[in-house]
């Protein structure tokens, strides 16, 4: 049972080392990844663009809500 926890700790340590390791041009190795996440984060999208409404969006009926969400009290809520 110690193997999964040890693997998780090693992976997290590697990520923290990579994050802190300076790159010659950008300052750290994961700067580009951080920029990509920041620029491509489109949540929450407008419901018209998505085709359905996400959790906690206002709704009128259950067919408007995405996935397992259901319209309850005028809000898309997880079931």
Swiss-Prot record:
Keyword Secreted set for record: yes
Outcome of swapping residue 73 to A: Decrease in activity
Outcome when changing residue 58 to A: No change in activity
Effect of residue 78 to A: Loss of activity on Nav1.2
Effect listed in the UniProt record for changing residue 61 to A: No change in activity
Family the UniProt entry places it in: Belongs to the neurotoxin 15 family. 01 (magi-5) subfamily.
Protein name in the entry: Beta-hexatoxin-Mg1a
Tissue specificity as recorded in UniProt: Expressed by the venom gland.
Notes on the domains: The presence of a 'disulfide through disulfide knot' structurally defines this protein as a knottin.
Xref: InterPro entries: Toxin_23 (IPR012628)
Pfam families, per the entry: Toxin_23
Prosegment residue ranges: 21-50
Source organism: Macrothele gigas (Japanese funnel web spider)
């Amino acid at each position: 049972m110690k193997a999964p926890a040890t693997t998780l700790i090693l992976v997290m340590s590697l990520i923290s080392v990579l994050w802190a390791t300076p790159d010659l041009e950008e300052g750290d190795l994961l700067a580009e990844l951080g920029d990509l996440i920041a620029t491509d984060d489109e949540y929450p999208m407008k419901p018209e663009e998505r085709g359905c409404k996400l959790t906690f969006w206002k709704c009128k009926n259950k067919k408007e809500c995405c996935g397992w969400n259901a319209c309850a009290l005028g809000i898309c809520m997880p079931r």
